[in-house]
C-alpha cells in the first residue's frame, strides 16, 4: 500500500516536472507589444512601439498604435533563421505616402524579453533598430 502511494506521488511529480516548461510558453514568438527605437545615427533616434498579433494563421500588427498608427501589410517570421520581415505604408506629416520595410532577427528567443535588431527603412531614410518585447 505504501509502495503504491509512493509510486503515485513520484509519478505525479514527474508529470508536473514535464508539464511545467509547457506552461511557461508564451505562444507565438512575435506576439505582444514591442518598444525601442530606430535611427540613421546613434544621435538621431526615433522611439517606436510595435504591436504584433497571431491569429493562428497570420501575423498582423501596427506600428505606433494610436492616432498616427500604421497597420502592417506584410509580416513574416522564418523559424529556421528567426528572420523577421515587416512591411507597411503610412503617411508623413504632409499626408504623402511613406513606405516602411523592416528586416531583423529575433534574438534571446527563450526569454520573455526577447528582442529584434536589424534594418529599418522609412521612406527614403534607412537606419538600424532595436525593439524589446514589453
Where are these regions (language model features)?
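Bacterial N-terminal signal peptides
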Residues: 10-21
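Bacterial N-terminal signal peptides that target proteins for export
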Residues: 1-11
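Central antiparallel beta-sheet cores of small beta-barrel/beta-sandwich binding domains
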Residues: 25-134
Amino acid at each position: 500500500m505504501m509502495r503504491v502511494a509512493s509510486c503515485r506521488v513520484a509519478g505525479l511529480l514527474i508529470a508536473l516536472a514535464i508539464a511545467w516548461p509547457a506552461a511557461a510558453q508564451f505562444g507565438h514568438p512575435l506576439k505582444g507589444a514591442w518598444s525601442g527605437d530606430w535611427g540613421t545615427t546613434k544621435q538621431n533616434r526615433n522611439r517606436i512601439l510595435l504591436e504584433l498579433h497571431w491569429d493562428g494563421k497570420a501575423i498582423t500588427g501596427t506600428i505606433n498604435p494610436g492616432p498616427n498608427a500604421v497597420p502592417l501589410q506584410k509580416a513574416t517570421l522564418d523559424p529556421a533563421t528567426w528572420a523577421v520581415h515587416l512591411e507597411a505604408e503610412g503617411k508623413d506629416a504632409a499626408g504623402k505616402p511613406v513606405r516602411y520595410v523592416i528586416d531583423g532577427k529575433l534574438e534571446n528567443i527563450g526569454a520573455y524579453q526577447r528582442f529584434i535588431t536589424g534594418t529599418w527603412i522609412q521612406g527614403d531614410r534607412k537606419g538600424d533598430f532595436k525593439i524589446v518585447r514589453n
